């Protein structure tokens, strides 16, 4: 079982490392790492290539987390290891070997993992995050608020300790990945969704 568990974590990491944004952009003749923010994620694809490619990338990245969790469950892993497979997918997305161990910020893959692990916690976080983005037009603020909502829900609903720890880790990692965005939000120069770059 140790071998199966180790392989599941490794495969989950590799699933997460599939650089959907880079591949979709490359088909359009664009190196996503050299345009916009340089981030290999759906938001940069949206700003650089438009809604269609961005939706495709977002859906793929969400599925990476969900597939990793589903694979672990299909293999009969216990809930904690199943959750860790989701974490591995997020780490693969953020630090992809296909992109020199760089990648995106893990927002879509984190929410895909949370939705698969606990639809109530993940769904609530998703709704709050999207709502914040819709109201403020700040993708970074919505992403962070959504992740923190997941932690709050997991604690308030008395979910198992392993789930609370996993969700808290994902929220902390996501927030860290947005540290530059947080500085820009504090300085008042973070770009809103749909805002053109000067």
Swiss-Prot record:
GO molecular-function terms, A-Z: acyl-phosphate glycerol-3-phosphate acyltransferase activity
Pfam families, sorted: G3P_acyltransf
EC supergroup of this enzyme: transferase
Membrane-spanning parts: 1-21, 52-72, 81-101, 115-135, 153-173
GO terms classed as biological process: phospholipid biosynthetic process
GO CC annotation: plasma membrane
Subcellular location: Cell membrane
Pathway: Lipid metabolism; phospholipid metabolism
Alphabetized InterPro entries for the sequence: G3P_acylTferase_PlsY
EC number: 2.3.1.275
Keywords assigned: Cell membrane, Lipid biosynthesis, Lipid metabolism, Membrane, Phospholipid biosynthesis, Phospholipid metabolism, Transferase, Transmembrane, Transmembrane helix
Catalytic activity: an acyl phosphate + sn-glycerol 3-phosphate = a 1-acyl-sn-glycero-3-phosphate + phosphate
Membrane topology reported for the UniProt record: Multi-pass membrane protein
Chief location: membrane
Free-text function comment from the UniProt entry: Catalyzes the transfer of an acyl group from acyl-phosphate (acyl-PO(4)) to glycerol-3-phosphate (G3P) to form lysophosphatidic acid (LPA). This enzyme utilizes acyl-phosphate as fatty acyl donor, but not acyl-CoA or acyl-ACP.
Stated family: Belongs to the PlsY family.
NCBIfam families in the cross-refs: glycerol-3-phosphate 1-O-acyltransferase PlsY
Quaternary state and interactors: Probably interacts with PlsX.
Protein name: Glycerol-3-phosphate acyltransferase
Annotated source species: Deinococcus geothermalis (strain DSM 11300 / CIP 105573 / AG-3a)
């Amino acid at each position: 079982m140790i071998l199966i568990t180790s392989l599941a974590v490794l495969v989950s990491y590799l699933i997460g490392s599939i650089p959907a944004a880079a591949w979709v952009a490359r088909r359009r003749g664009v190196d996503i790492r050299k345009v916009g923010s340089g981030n290999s994620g759906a938001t940069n694809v949206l700003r650089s290539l438009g809604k269609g490619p961005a939706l495709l990338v977002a859906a793929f990245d969400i599925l990476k987390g969900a597939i990793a969790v589903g694979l672990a469950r299909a293999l009969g892993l216990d809930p904690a290891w199943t959750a860790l497979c989701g974490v591995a997918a997020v780490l693969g997305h953020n630090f992809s070997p296909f992109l020199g161990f760089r990648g995106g910020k893990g927002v879509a893959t984190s929410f895909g993992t949370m939705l698969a692990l606990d639809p109530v916690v993940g769904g609530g976080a998703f709704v709050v995050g999207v709502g914040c983005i819709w109201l403020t037009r700040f993708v970074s603020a919505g992403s962070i608020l959504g992740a923190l909502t997941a932690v709050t829900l997991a604690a308030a609903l008395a979910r198992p300790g392993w789930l609370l720890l996993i969700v808290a880790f994902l929220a902390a990692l996501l927030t860290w990945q947005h540290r530059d965005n947080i500085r820009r939000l504090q300085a008042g120069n973070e770009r809103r969704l749909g805002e053109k770059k000067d």
